Amino acid sequence: MLIIEDLRAFEVLDSRGNPTIKAEIMLSDGSMGSAIVPSGASTGKKEALELRDNDERFGGKGVLKAIENINGTIAENIIGLDAFNQTQLDNTLLELDGTKNYSNLGANATLGISMATARAAANALGIPLYRYLGGANASVLPVPMCNIINGGAHANNNVDFQEFMIMPFGFSSFKEGLRSVCEIYAILKKELAALGYSTALGDEGGFAPNLANNTEPLDLLMTCIKKAGYENKIKLALDVASSELYKDGKYYLEGKVFSNEDLIARYEELCAKYPIFSIEDGLAEDDYEGWIKLTQKLGNKIQLVGDDLFVTNEDILREGILKNMANAVLIKPNQIGTITQTMRTVRLAHRNNYRCIMSHRSGESEDAFIADFAVALNTGQIKTGALARGERTAKYNRLLEIELDNDEYLGDKL
């Protein structure tokens, strides 16, 4: 048994220049592990609490309170625990906090410790993180959902939908699929410039031009896919983030007002016209009636992903499964607070034939933990932004490294 011998946490910066937590764990054999916690912009109401200082520093976004919790209460209670018993560690963190959403210690504090301990344990054994967390069956490279046009809360433009993504299905390897996305991304930049559109980037590395409506990005993507020579090998995915468009039971976009039935009809039209594989957060997190209707209409045709709807929460997902809402769940560890709770949600989804998509947050870092985690849990899909900005490419580069020892790419088998 190796025990947690020491730990520390301190402020670092995320990709938006906001403070976040870096946690470091030291084990009794001298092994170490560290982790940097991400942060979201478009967040679900039921996410675990990200503890911020709310004072004059960094416009209130400092995390010194959470760091004090790590270096104080958490350290006092986990030093001496078995580093290889992740469940015991994470249960201890949950019990220490005393709430379901980590409103005392902060989910950013607990997740940092949870991630760093897993990494330290893997380092102690001299094995990759994905192998430590996933065992012998962790070997499948996920299909990336590459967000190459940004809108909504991730960009300062007039596009309502938050993410327009491409997914490389028709390839035999992850690296070839990634290459196709890189080539399409480069063509898109030239296409936007030729049309006189901005090629400025959004939070996740995608382009963020002002466009006529929410279908022009889809037309642009189809043009670029064709120019790159990858027709029939690439599918499209959307993150509508519709909770951001929802007010008083209605949806406000493109200068119009939509009921949930109107919006569902809009999605049906889009799916008939474009090769759309997936729609995320197609309806607001509180619009349960709408989600049931959407799943009845499109659930047998495309992937319907709940992000704000489920917030990586096992209990909320279980309720959604019983109500037949969505058929897939986005997996964001910082929505729930520990590695163990994240894994439980994935297992519940898989037992009920719900797909899983491992996901970054818009406020990210160079930490590539989720790349290993996606392979460990065989999620089959990963969202980690565009092929630009180092905090995004860090995850892709880690997956390329993992592929050197694992040559199975899900691709068309998804």
UniProtKB/Swiss-Prot annotation:
Pathway: Carbohydrate degradation; glycolysis; pyruvate from D-glyceraldehyde 3-phosphate: step 4/5
Cellular component GO terms, alphabetical: cell surface; extracellular region; phosphopyruvate hydratase complex
Catalytic activity: (2R)-2-phosphoglycerate = phosphoenolpyruvate + H2O
Keywords per UniProt: Cytoplasm, Glycolysis, Lyase, Magnesium, Metal-binding, Secreted
EC annotation from Swiss-Prot or TrEMBL: 4.2.1.11
Domain of life where this protein originates: Bacteria
Role noted for this protein: Catalyzes the reversible conversion of 2-phosphoglycerate (2-PG) into phosphoenolpyruvate (PEP). It is essential for the degradation of carbohydrates via glycolysis.
HAMAP family xrefs: Enolase
Name of the protein described by the UniProt record: Enolase
Protein source organism: Campylobacter lari (strain RM2100 / D67 / ATCC BAA-1060)
Source organism phylogeny: Bacteria, Pseudomonadati, Campylobacterota, Epsilonproteobacteria, Campylobacterales
